[in-house]
Amino acid sequence: MGPNPMKMYPIEGNKSVQFIKPILEKLENVEVGEYSYYDSKNGETFDKQILYHYPILNDKLKIGKFCSIGPGVTIIMNGANHRMDGSTYPFNLFGNGWEKHMPKLDQLPIKGDTIIGNDVWIGKDVVIMPGVKIGDGAIVAANSVVVKDIAPYMLAGGNPANEIKQRFDQDTINQLLDIKWWNWPIDIINENIDKILDNSIIREVIWKK
């Protein structure tokens, strides 16, 4: 029961909605969970939305399970960063003698890994900047630019994106983070989808590892 998480296009006849694990798992320094999907604008695959991700920098992109990623979402990785201790112009890119001015890694503002949690909803045309961590269950409003971390189960939006409000009270959030339903075996998830959708899973112990 349920769709095959390794089938790129899980909806018959629909080439816009795509599970991203089979697309991204072949990329270096990328980890992605099952059932996370991208709703593309024009059929572009989600790997095209990850920019400036160069293996030499060794920064990782981690995306959890059951994430909903809207059209046009772009993830900017650390390779986009320029030196900022003087001129930001990348002279070395253009060769012809300028290549000798290649910056050292410790001269670049490397922000670390970019991490998107589980059950995260990212709206249309959101831009996620390098090194950001978006917590489990968070929602990011359309057209936002995420430049700093977003806490679990937080609604955030704007340019730059700010945390607007918690989706639930702190006790409920703590229970959801303890339950971690996205890590349940898929047969247990299948049996409890309605309870996952209305949050009644926090009122009973359904499954414990």
Curated annotation (Swiss-Prot):
The keyword Ribosomal protein does not apply. The active site is at H82. Transmembrane segments: none annotated. One of its GO terms (biological process) is response to antibiotic. It is an enzyme of class 2 (transferase). Keywords: Acyltransferase, Antibiotic resistance, Repeat, Transferase. InterPro entries: Hexapep, Hexapep_transf_CS, Trans_hexapeptide_repeat, Trimer_LpxA-like_sf. Its EC number is 2.3.1.-. Changing H82A: 105-fold decrease in activity. Homohexamer. This is Streptogramin A acetyltransferase. It comes from Enterococcus faecium. The lineage of its organism: Bacteria, Bacillati, Bacillota, Bacilli, Lactobacillales.
